[in-house]
Amino acid sequence: MTQQTMSFQAEVKQLLHLMIHSLYSNKEIFLRELVSNASDAADKLRFEALENNALYESDPNLRIRLSFDKAARTITIDDNGIGMSRDEAIANLGTIARSGTKEFFSKLSGDQQKDAALIGQFGVGFYSGFIVADRITVETRRAGLPASEGVRWESAGEGDFQVDTIERAARGTTITLHLREGEDELLSSYRLKSIVQKYSDHVALPILMKKEEWDQEKGEMVEKDEDETINQASALWTRAKSEVTDEQYKQFYQHVAHDHQDPLAWTHNRVEGRSEYTQLLFVPSHAPFDLWNRDYRGGLKLYVKRVFIMDDAEQLLPQYLRFIKGVVDSSDLPLNVSREILQESRDVKAIREGVTKRALSMLEELANAEDDAGKEKYKTFWSAFGQVLKEGVGEDHANRERVAKLLRFASTHGDTDAQDVALADYVARMKPEQTKLYYVTADTWQAAKNSPHLEVFRKKGVEVLLLTDRVDEWMLSFLHEFDGKPLASVARGDLDLGALNDDEKKAQEETGEAMKPVVDKMKETLGEKVKDVRVTFRLTDSPSCLVADDNDMSGYLQRMLKAAGQSAPSFQPILEINPEHPLVKALKADGADFGDWCHLLFDQALLAEGGALEDPASFVKRTNALLLSRAA
């Protein structure tokens, strides 16, 4: 096929502009990204060769070679991995295939460190070569294709690229960067080695360069015809923990997670017994941009006897731990393992159980830290992944209690929206006569804090958890108790805050009896809007509030389901009125404006709990009429 000139996808043009103009001060990342791509190409070859050994083409020793040419002002990264066909070169180098391109650009912050990290996260690291090069030439041939089907891809990064078919004997990919003016400091063995050792020391493939020695006569370093390996070139997880420094763990995390920030914590151990495997797990310090996308692929890198099998092996972790990054290397799984086999394998189930327990232990260590730095780390973790962890209460019955101990909430104990109260903290502060853990759900912390349902709790000094995450109502349908004590909504059913003395009981019964004509008339007036109307003693400042019956769906959950486009049964609440409030005291069952007051009390209660009025215009009209009648 003759040479073709093709245009980059629009997003690639935008990306190239970003690379060249925005990331210059962090230019070293180009080598990190290209070495990472070469390592991935070797992993892919190993995987495909499991079923077709001929793909090695009598060259099974995989490596990456790095070289430079001062005269030509080029840097070359060469690998003997899987390589690319013509179609693959066009697809991989001319477009951003991954969904989420818009999210990528929306995430760019102008912070060069953060933006540089996103490049790897989105799989567009190849283009980082244009930070230092004004032209890139790629020569490649896919393993298994004839030498006549080699491909040359070339671009100056200005909107288009050329693709040509060439003769290429060796499989794999050779990338040549033609450096921009002013980049000659990169044409140094010492400089390139230092970048590799900084970013890619942990890559399990040997990275080779020609040895250099000092020539006394010439007074300069000269290249020898002998290779040297410039990185550690061993799978970090196979080494003993005592041989790995914290810095090496952090670098390895940044490699596997495509993240520029350090992890919050990690755990590394070998498991022996029914299943034999090594696990190296990390807790990131921030959530990936697409954590809540439907097509988000969580999971760990899976190796079998150090042979890469797949990225994102979701079967090794439950969904609620999808943010955990790392590697599992099994000694028992077959090398030809597929995603389907992973679903059914008994060995995988055992690994999943072990990995889950280890991940939870790591989080427990973070959560139980006594020092300020440790406490700060758990706060960081919770703000990034707390809502995801809450899913575990419903998803993981076996570990529900462990997950519950890791949960954090805002509460009336503090005066901020910080979610820093553990359920164990709440239990430790419970009143002697208190038998339940109380909570309120709302759309916002402000709405929860000011909920009329809290009035009597404040009066009696009883702490209430303020729950404002969308997942909370769903979670609570699985979390019925903690430490043997039931969880109770302050907006559901009859309220029992401890025994009343005889005088209090008698006074409440008398008040209820006196209010009966008003209550009955209100029930008749509001009709289908309410399930019941009753006198309450849970309010101190507000005239009314809405509560759900014990077995009914709450108004908050109904609103949440509707917002998600799901069908929800109609919310028929119980209207509770405060007999001590002046507005309620002034109600007369035979008054001309009684109906308007009934609807106003209902609408006010609905608004106070974050609900939406069915007919706002009538509410305004009714309110104005009542204000005018009072003013008159």
Curated annotation (Swiss-Prot):
Belongs to the heat shock protein 90 family. The keyword Zinc does not apply. GO terms for molecular function: ATP binding; ATP hydrolysis activity; ATP-dependent protein folding chaperone; unfolded protein binding. The gene is htpG. InterPro entries: HATPase_C_sf (IPR036890), Heat_shock_protein_90_CS (IPR019805), HSP90_C (IPR037196), Hsp90_fam (IPR001404), Hsp90_N (IPR020575), Ribosomal_Su5_D2-typ_SF (IPR020568). Keywords: ATP-binding, Chaperone, Cytoplasm, Nucleotide-binding, Stress response. The lineage of its organism: Bacteria, Pseudomonadati, Pseudomonadota, Betaproteobacteria, Burkholderiales. Residues 1-339 are annotated as: A. Residues 560-632 are annotated as: C. It is found in: Cytoplasm. PANTHER family: HEAT SHOCK PROTEIN 90 FAMILY MEMBER (PTHR11528). NCBIfam families: PRK05218.1. Molecular chaperone. Has ATPase activity. CDD domains: HATPase_Hsp90-like. HAMAP family: HSP90 (MF_00505). It comes from Burkholderia pseudomallei (strain 1106a). Its main location: cytoplasm. This is Chaperone protein HtpG. GO terms for cellular component: cytoplasm. It comes from the Bacteria. Homodimer. SUPFAM superfamilies: ATPase domain of HSP90 chaperone/DNA topoisomerase II/histidine kinase, HSP90 C-terminal domain, Ribosomal protein S5 domain 2-like.
